[in-house]
UniProtKB/Swiss-Prot annotation:
Entry-linked CDD domains: NAD_bind_m-THF_DH_Cyclohyd
Protein name as it appears in the record: Bifunctional protein FolD
Gene3D superfamilies listed in its UniProt record: Leucine Dehydrogenase, chain A, domain 1, NAD(P)-binding Rossmann-like Domain
Lineage: Archaea, Methanobacteriati, Thermoplasmatota, Thermoplasmata, Thermoplasmatales
Signal peptide location: none
């Protein structure tokens, strides 16, 4: 039987339509300010993609690009944007110069404008099952699994970062999955992965996960984005894995489109919250 491809574009489009309706109901375009420090072409590409998607739903997404800023100058700019009642979301683009620690910077963004959802408040809210704004990639994985009907089952996540593995493990626990989380020091990842219905991989290594990690009933979610010979590929050996498993996400076209939309979903939720509570105004 042919492998089932878990595509994300349709999910992203449906979410975008819902966001557009919510913005029309608000009567005001939510505003997201992206802060980029340094000349990183990949960061600029991702920022422009968010601007483009924002326009489609009626959101005002702007990029502030700086050749060089100190940590203190960047924090000062974040404080200015935090105090601006017309700004609903703030996002610092990765990577930053080596002299600036990303997570130190994120702590200075108010939780209700933190559309990347990496602040201690938003991460902690996930841990106690009181989700507010959630990391976009982790939410994209949850969205795909829900859309295709893979819920409340066993899952192995091969990643422990604050962007994917840690929040996703807690978000899946909140939704009654039974979760194992693996990392570079985990012995015998293959056995753990094979014992789970769902396998989520995000290790930043093209072709890392091959057919020795999976069974015929495995559902594989590939979060990896790698550039190899001008092509975008994931963290799995797609040809080998797709020959064996029940279902798999393609790269590109799987998690990616939903991730971009989920940033805007956080923006709209933040704007609604600020309007309803009058916080930050």
């Amino acid at each position: 039987m042919a492998v089932k491809l878990l595509k994300g574009e349709e999910i992203a489009e449906k979410k975008a339509e819902e966001l557009k309706e919510r913005i029309e109901k608000m009567g005001v375009s939510p505003r997201l300010v992206l802060l980029q420090v340094g000349n990183y072409s990949a960061a600029t590409i991702y920022a422009r993609a968010k601007i483009k998607r924002g326009k489609k739903i009626g959101a005002d997404v702007v990029l502030e690009k700086y050749e060089d800023l100190t940590k203190q100058e960047l924090v000062r700019r974040i404080e200015e944007l935090s105090a601006d009642k017309d700004v609903n979301g703030i996002m610092v683009e990765n990577p930053l110069p080596k002299t600036i620690d990303y997570y130190d910077i994120v702590k200075s963004i108010p939780y209700y404008k933190d559309v990347d959802a990496l602040s201690p408040y938003n991460q902690g809210s996930i841990a106690i099952n009181r989700e507010f704004l959630v990391p976009a990639t982790a939410m994209a994985v949850v969205d795909i699994l829900k859309y295709y009907g893979y819920e409340k089952t066993t899952a192995t996540i091969i990643n422990r970062s604050p962007v994917v593995g840690r929040p996703l493990s807690m978000m899946m626990l909140n939704r009654d999955y039974t979760v194992s989380i693996c990392h570079s020091k985990t012995p015998d990842i293959r056995s753990i992965a094979k014992a789970s219905k769902i396998i989520v991989v995000a290790v930043g290594r093209p072709g890392f996960l091959d057919d020795t990690y999976v069974t015929e009933s495995s559902v594989v979610i590939d979060v990896g984005i790698n550039y190899v010979q001008d092509k975008v590929i994931g963290d799995i050996d797609f040809d080998k894995v797709s020959e064996k498993v029940e279902a798999v996400t393609p790269v590109p076209g799987g998690v990616g489109p939903i991730t971009a939309t989920n940033i805007l979903s956080n923006l709209v939720k933040a704007a609604e919250y600020q309007s309803n509570t009058n916080i930050g105004r």
